[in-house]
Regions:
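Acidic, glycine-enriched catalytic cores built around paired aspartates
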Residues: 1-197
Length: 197
């Protein structure tokens, strides 16, 4: 007990799954024409979407602002709920594998996401929808307010060394450049090859 804090701070963690699909679907409703398709009982079972709409993960403020608004609105709703033992409510956008399970149990969306297919993990753009590259998706995720997701926000990317360049020096320089573009607001921390890092 000697290592316990004198005053215990409790948190209650909640999470968002499918953020990119919700953002893209709301963008489709706002910028395109979306028609619900109903079954014989009147239940909406699919959508027909006509026209173009911006998508989250491409550094397009129209879609990225929708995603940020969703995260903020959900967190505001959570904050309004009294928490057990005065816990501090928190939220995450960082599914690990649950995005697959949730997607398999969910219907179609106005964005074109098909029934029964996995959601993108965490704050990633919808699978196959990001067309402007890794840096654009990093910039989109960077528009989410961390104060609304204190449990964490994840963006999963995969790069092979060969995809970064031919020589080790080129690979290091390109990787640092990608990270700088996504995380450094100016060039004050830009890569300097003379420093050996």
């Amino acid at each position: 007990m000697a290592l316990h804090d004198a005053e215990i701070v409790r948190t209650m963690g909640c999470g968002i799954a499918g953020l990119s699909i919700v953002a893209d679907s709301l963008a489709a409703i706002k910028y395109a024409k979306v028609y619900p398709i109903r079954d014989e009982t009147g239940l909406v079972v699919d959508y027909r979407t006509e026209g173009d709409f911006p998508t989250y993960g491409n550094d397009d403020d129209r879609a990225d602002d929708i995603a940020a608004t969703v995260v903020h609105t959900v967190m505001d709703k959570i904050r309004a709920i009294p928490m057990y033992r005065d816990a501090i409510p928190t939220q995450s956008v960082l599914t690990i594998t649950s995005n697959v399970v949730y997607g398999k149990a969910t219907g179609s969306f106005p964005s074109g996401h098909e029934k029964g297919t996995p959601f993108a993990p965490g704050a990633n753009p919808e699978n196959g929808i990001d067309t402007h590259g890794m840096v654009a998706s990093m910039l989109s995720v960077g528009k989410l307010d961390y104060n609304d997701a204190l449990d964490g926000i994840s963006l999963t990317n995969t790069i092979t060394p060969q995809g970064l360049g031919r020589s080790k020096e080129e690979q290091i320089q390109n990787l640092v450049g990608i990270l700088d573009a996504g995380f450094v607001p100016d060039d004050s921390c830009a890569y300097d090859g003379t420093k050996g890092y």
